[in-house]
Design a protein with these regions (language model features):
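Metalloprotease/metallohydrolase-associated module, dominated by Zn2+-dependent proteases
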Residues: 21-55, 94-228
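Generic preference for well-ordered secondary structure
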Residues: 17, 60-67, 121, 155
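Short pre-active-site segment immediately N-terminal to the catalytic Zn-binding motif
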Residues: 58-78, 92-95
């Protein structure tokens, strides 16, 4: 007769538990490394974002990395922004909504990604998306701060490379708020930083969960139950 091991299922359970623990440790490590990257990004952001007041230009490697990043990010946001306008052109929205829809899409894009991951139970990924909502809003704050330059956005400043209407000059003028452009841009910048900070704090608590004691208690309880 073939030999059977009556304790085989116990070995399998232990192997699965070890694999689960190893997988959990790997995920936590990945989260902590990612958190470190975002903390560093947030600390350096005011010095290397080309539209920030404290921006200082240099030829350092860090500057070049940020320049490349902002180029890619701005192209992505630009495509989404113009897509928002495009939807309104197709649907024949009122002119004010058409002007606003570019920024709405630009903020909704990372926001909906965050909502998707949140509904799937992936809080860390949702917080990363929330961080980019703040990043996108920071870009919006800069765009707001240029509203005083005029209704017509010159081709060399336009994403599409042609003369265009400045969204915020149009909207602020329509609401009689153009004189308060600096205040509105400043408040928007503050909210953007607040969102990014909240996202990073959330990542920290998710990357450093206080579950070690709970796991130990669970293991002891499980062993005690088997012994009894």
């Amino acid at each position: 007769m073939p030999e059977t091991n009556p304790f085989k299922h116990l070995h399998q359970d232990n192997a699965k538990e070890e694999e689960s623990e190893s997988s959990l440790r790997s995920r936590i490590l990945a989260k902590r490394v990612t958190l470190g990257v975002f903390v560093l990004f947030l600390l350096l952001f005011p010095h290397y974002a080309p539209w920030e007041p404290s921006y200082t230009q240099s030829n350092s490697l860090t500057q070049q990395i940020f320049t490349l990043y902002f180029f890619v990010a701005n192209q992505t946001l630009g495509i989404v922004h113009e897509g928002g306008h495009g939807v309104c052109y197709i649907l024949h929205c009122p002119e004010f909504i058409t002007m606003a829809n570019g920024t709405i899409f630009q903020l909704l894009f990372p926001g909906l990604i965050g909502y998707y991951y949140y509904k799937r139970g992936n809080l860390f990924a949702a917080l990363i998306a929330l961080f980019f909502v703040g990043f996108s809003l920071q870009y919006t704050a800069w765009y707001l701060s240029t509203a005083h330059e005029g209704l017509i956005l010159p081709a060399h400043k336009s994403f599409l490379g042609v003369d265009a209407i400045h969204d915020f000059n149009y909207m602020l003028s329509a609401m009689g708020l153009l004189a308060y452009e600096s205040l509105i841009a400043g408040l928007t910048r503050f909210v953007a930083y607040l969102i990014m900070l909240v996202a990073v704090i959330g990542m920290f608590f998710d990357a450093f969960p206080n579950q070690d004691k709970k796991r130990k208690v669970k293991r002891r309880w499980g062993r005690g139950k088997k012994d009894s």
